[in-house]
């Protein structure tokens, strides 16, 4: 257990520190108008449009809208998708949206508030409430499109956005089905640590650190960047500062660390992704400590939930725990020989057929 905790802590620290350095259609523009920075294989038969819309806080959300062939001839089912936490729509969420479009769904991948190309005066911060609201704002947008059936809209959350997708489905009854992949409950993760390893004493130390950081930010009139999950050394000292990580993967790196590194630093690198080029604001965890994303998990029913996790994923327990807590209808799918990051972009491991079947059956 200790090895797993230290491994995940190393990953999170790494992700926060490397290279610190007139209607809705009128808001659309062709994806080709600007340089295409998507990091996955692009299908020429699937049209993508750059779109913008506002959430109820007035924050402008940027999205990539993927359109199935012959979409104008009918009212289509639709899906909103976002994640992983700190990633951008040109990475995993865009891959998912494009693939779901091949199954006949209008699919919208979006950057949450304060990240990517979306608005928000403070950059690189997050809120469980606002990120959840972004899902509902995406539903608003889709439901006003002439070619979308507003009664057939679903949601997908990847990694850390899974909790927001489920929470949105618990309140927004317009979301008729919700699926998660490699789920993380960010409220639980930030306030309790991986596998809930924080002791009461450690939790107190983190609260003191976050409180003191607020004084520093107030005095400097800036928002310092830092690790969103502080960790503790062998002497139980809180280690909150960013750790310098070599550009090259260390030879002794374990498989979990290597999987994250190879995705964010190598094959799916994107300059706007928080998970590699910069960091979250240091005080960002405060709102996740204050508000639990899973507080209304039982309210999701009767909206169907599909939880997908790899059998080797360090995050698997999140999906299993939510499956136990959620009411029917619900389904848990464990993908054989798959780790956490495999479900970001491994086309041989992501069960798109299952996702298509799930949404086809429940978006009727």
Regions found by a protein language model. Name each.
Residues 32-74:
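N-terminal cap/lid segment of alpha/beta-hydrolase-fold proteins
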Residues 74-84:
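Short beta-strand element of the alpha/beta-hydrolase
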Residues 86-98, 112:
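The serine-hydrolase catalytic nucleophile loop
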Residues 99-119:
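Conserved alpha/beta-hydrolase
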Residues 125-146:
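Alpha/beta-hydrolase active-site loop
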Residues 167-259:
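Alpha/beta-hydrolase-fold enzymes
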Residues 300, 307-309:
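Short beta-strand/loop motif that positions the catalytic acidic residue
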Residues 338-349:
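Catalytic histidine-centered segment of alpha/beta-hydrolase-like enzymes
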């Amino acid at each position: 257990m200790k090895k797993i905790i230290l491994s995940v802590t190393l990953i999170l620290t790494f992700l926060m520190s490397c290279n610190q350095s007139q209607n809705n259609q009128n808001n659309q523009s062709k994806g080709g108008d600007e340089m295409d920075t998507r990091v996955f294989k692009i299908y020429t038969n699937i049209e993508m449009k750059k779109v913008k819309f506002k959430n109820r806080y007035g924050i402008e959300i940027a999205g990539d809208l993927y359109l199935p062939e012959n979409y104008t001839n009918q009212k289509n089912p639709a899906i909103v998708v976002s994640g992983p936490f700190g990633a951008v729509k040109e990475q995993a969420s865009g891959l998912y949206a494009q693939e779901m479009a091949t199954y006949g769904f209008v699919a919208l991948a979006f950057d949450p508030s304060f990240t990517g190309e979306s608005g928000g005066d403070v950059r690189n911060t997050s809120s469980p409430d606002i990120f959840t609201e972004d899902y509902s704002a995406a539903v608003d947008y889709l439901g006003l499109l002439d070619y979308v059936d507003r009664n057939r809209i679903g949601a997908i959350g990847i990694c850390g956005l899974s909790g927001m997708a489920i929470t949105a489905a618990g309140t927004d009854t317009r979301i008729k089905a919700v699926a998660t992949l490699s789920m993380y409950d960010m409220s639980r993760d930030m306030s309790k640590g991986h596998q809930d390893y924080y002791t009461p004493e450690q939790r107190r130390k983190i609260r003191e650190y976050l409180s003191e950081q607020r004084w520093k930010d107030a005095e400097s009139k800036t928002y310092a960047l830092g690790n969103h999950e502080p960790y503790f050394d062998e002497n139980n000292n809180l280690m909150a500062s960013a750790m310098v990580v070599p550009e090259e993967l260390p030879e002794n790196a374990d498989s979990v660390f290597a999987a994250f590194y190879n995705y964010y630093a190598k094959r799916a690198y994107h300059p706007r992704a928080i998970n590699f080029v910069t960091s979250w604001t240091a005080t960002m965890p405060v709102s996740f400590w204050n508000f639990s994303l899973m507080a209304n998990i039982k309210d999701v029913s009767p909206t169907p939930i599909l939880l997908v996790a790899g059998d080797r994923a360090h995050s698997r327990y999140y999906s299993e725990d939510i499956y136990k807590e959620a009411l029917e209808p619900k389904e848990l799918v464990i993908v054989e020989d798959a780790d956490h990051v495999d479900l970001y972009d491994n086309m041989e491991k992501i069960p798109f057929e299952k996702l298509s079947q799930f949404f086809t059956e429940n978006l009727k």
